[in-house]
């Protein structure tokens, strides 16, 4: 019995300059570590078949399923502000596309499946640690309600990859609305290939923004659509304390999904200047810098689209600037609305923004845990005697002074205390992928081939907003000797 993938490929039908055709490199002894069964069903796949040895071979790239048209996508990108005219998929191969049960076209890609023409002296492989990290964090982001690529499966290859040392090799099966990036447009812009830019833009509109088909200025509207999605996405990141870590233009998705989880991390103690990525030495992609960087990336996209805006270059630049000018307001609106919900304010009044900023300033000064402070505020909103939020502050008096003003403001809200607590708990997670927990999972898997911690963490993070008494310890911030100070890309 064969494993069937109902491929309906479109990107591989574009001109050859958009990609390189390349098959995955077979591996020695693939073994399935984790299959995301609900996602498999959503994609129209048979999870029981994927869990067979034959399924593991496909998910590891050892065999290519019928209907696949494997390609490595071409793109360029600004990496930490420096432009690289050719990057491309150096260790990822797009098997093809399927239409899921909601009628949405989804890419199925293998990460770590061997070298491609874009590998730049790399081995095209992935180590087990980064594969598990992306599986954990991408699925946690999905459960948090944040647009993201998904993880269908993690497979160990039976081979080792050489990084600083020999590490177990693995392959991640990644699912995305698409893998088209700002850097994809840059690849053709630097080559002055306007026809390819138009072809790519038309493909993106048909795939991600079909409501723009037939409009008077579709390319202007496309830029506006990407600006809006990115502004709202980054606002959602900030609202859960997420730091992407490597917001290069080749990691900026046109569909508005979070993509590429290399050195990502969630904050423990609130610090607007927080950086975890070992390669972000200047703090370019620090927590509070993320909106500014998103706009910078979108400006690079706008530059690529200018030739499609019309022959009058000066006018085209003005139009692009007007569209980009919507980003700050769109971001601020989404971010402030989210913050109000996090503190239980479901109507908008003068002074709300200042009240919330005072809380954030006090949290930063007191090194209060970002996630738990907001979650405990929900408890305090439901029960005035609850003081768990107060316990997050080194100077409890600082919280008391703020809480007095907050309660006065809550009195003007129409909800009952119980309704408010329920609403706050629906936006303030209790469980996030704490860095020390992710690290413990990786160490157990890499050193002992033990995946019990991995399974348990994935299970807990699937319900981030629910109280899970049996797993309460997963909500705890790290002890001083458990703190993860740096994260690594793993490539």
UniProtKB/Swiss-Prot annotation:
Transmembrane segments: none annotated. Its cofactor is Mg(2+); Mn(2+). It is an enzyme of class 2 (transferase). It catalyses: L-seryl-[protein] + ATP = 3-O-(5'-adenylyl)-L-seryl-[protein] + diphosphate; L-threonyl-[protein] + ATP = 3-O-(5'-adenylyl)-L-threonyl-[protein] + diphosphate; L-tyrosyl-[protein] + ATP = O-(5'-adenylyl)-L-tyrosyl-[protein] + diphosphate; L-histidyl-[protein] + UTP = N(tele)-(5'-uridylyl)-L-histidyl-[protein] + diphosphate. The active site is at 250 (proton acceptor). Keywords: ATP-binding, Magnesium, Manganese, Metal-binding, Nucleotide-binding, Nucleotidyltransferase, Transferase. One of its GO terms (molecular function) is magnesium ion binding. ATP binds at residues 88, 90-91, 111, 123-124, 174, 181, 260. Its EC number is 2.7.7.-, 2.7.7.108. InterPro entries: SelO. Mg(2+) binds at residues 251, 260. The keyword Manganese applies. It holds the Pfam family SelO. Nucleotidyltransferase involved in the post-translational modification of proteins. It can catalyze the addition of adenosine monophosphate (AMP) or uridine monophosphate (UMP) to a protein, resulting in modifications known as AMPylation and UMPylation. Belongs to the SELO family. NCBIfam families: PRK00029.1. HAMAP family: YdiU_SelO. This is Protein nucleotidyltransferase YdiU. It comes from Bradyrhizobium diazoefficiens (strain JCM 10833 / BCRC 13528 / IAM 13628 / NBRC 14792 / USDA 110). The gene is ydiU.
């Amino acid at each position: 019995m064969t494993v069937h993938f109902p491929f309906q490929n479109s990107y591989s039908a574009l001109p050859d300059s958009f990609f390189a055709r390349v098959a995955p490199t077979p591996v020695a002894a693939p073994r399935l570590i984790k299959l995301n069964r609900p996602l498999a069903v959503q994609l129209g796949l048979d999870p029981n078949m994927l869990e067979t040895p034959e399924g593991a071979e496909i998910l590891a790239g050892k065999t290519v399923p019928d209907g696949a048209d494997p390609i490595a996508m071409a793109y360029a990108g600004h990496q930490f502000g420096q432009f690289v005219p050719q990057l491309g998929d150096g260790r990822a191969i797009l098997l093809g596309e399927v239409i899921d049960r909601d009628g949405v076209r989804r890419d199925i890609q293998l990460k770590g499946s061997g070298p491609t023409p874009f590998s730049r002296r790399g081995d095209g492989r992935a180590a087990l640690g980064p594969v598990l990290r992306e599986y954990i964090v991408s699925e946690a982001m999905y459960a948090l309600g944040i647009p993201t690529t998904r993880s269908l499966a993690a497979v160990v290859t039976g081979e080792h990859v050489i990084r600083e040392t020999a590490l177990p090799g693995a392959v991640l099966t990644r699912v995305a609305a698409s893998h088209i990036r700002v850097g994809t447009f840059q690849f053709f812009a630097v080559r002055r290939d306007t026809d390819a830019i138009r072809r790519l833009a038309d493909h993106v509109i048909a795939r991600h923004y079909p409501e723009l088909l037939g409009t008077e200025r579709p390319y202007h509207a496309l830029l506006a659509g990407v600006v809006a999605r990115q502004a709202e996405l980054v606002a959602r990141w900030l609202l859960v304390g997420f730091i992407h870590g490597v917001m290069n233009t080749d990691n900026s998705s046109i569909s508005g999904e979070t993509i590429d989880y290399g050195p990502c991390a969630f904050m423990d103690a609130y610090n607007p200047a927080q950086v975890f990525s070992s390669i972000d030495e200047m703090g370019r992609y620090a927590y509070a810098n993320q909106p500014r960087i998103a706009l910078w990336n979108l400006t690079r996209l706008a530059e690529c689209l200018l030739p499609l805006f019309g022959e009058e270059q000066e006018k085209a630049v003005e139009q692009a600037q007007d569209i980009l000018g919507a980003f700050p307001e769109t971001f601020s609106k989404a971010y402030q609305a989210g913050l109000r919900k996090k503190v239980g304010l479901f109507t908008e009044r003068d002074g709300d923004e200042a009240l919330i900023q005072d809380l954030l300033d006090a949290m930063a000064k007191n090194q209060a845990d970002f996630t738990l402070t907001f979650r405990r505020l929900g408890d305090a909103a439901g029960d005035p005697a609850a003081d768990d939020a107060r316990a997050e502050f080194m100077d409890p008096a600082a919280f008391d002074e703020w809480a007095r003003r907050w309660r006065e403001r809550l009195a003007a809200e129409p909800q009952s205390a119980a309704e408010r607590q329920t609403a706050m708990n629906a936006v303030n997670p209790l469980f996030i992928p704490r860095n020390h927990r992710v690290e413990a999972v990786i160490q157990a898997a890499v050193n002992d081939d033990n995946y019990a911690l991995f399974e348990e963490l994935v299970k807990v993070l699937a319900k981030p907003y629910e109280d899970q008494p049996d797993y309460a310890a997963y909500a705890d911030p790290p002890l001083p000797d458990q703190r993860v100070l740096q994260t690594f890309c793993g490539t």
